Amino acid sequence: MTQVTVGENEGIESALRRFKRQVSKSGIFADLKRLRHHETPIEKYKRKLQQRRKARRR
């Protein structure tokens, strides 16, 4: 979960910018868009395979 604490001398606009940056880095919206529709078993297999490859590279 993404959280942003607003400092005493910080404006709402800058906190909102930081929040948007954190959300885009974490990939939350990309996951929502991808999982919005039904996923066939072969698509699910390919997605999991790609996730494993990405995790192995790290």
Curated annotation (Swiss-Prot):
The keyword NADP does not apply. InterPro entries: Ribosomal_bS21, Ribosomal_bS21_CS, Ribosomal_bS21_sf. Keywords: Ribonucleoprotein, Ribosomal protein. GO terms for molecular function: structural constituent of ribosome. Signal peptide: none annotated. GO terms for biological process: translation. GO terms for cellular component: ribonucleoprotein complex; ribosome. Belongs to the bacterial ribosomal protein bS21 family. This is Small ribosomal subunit protein bS21. The gene is rpsU.
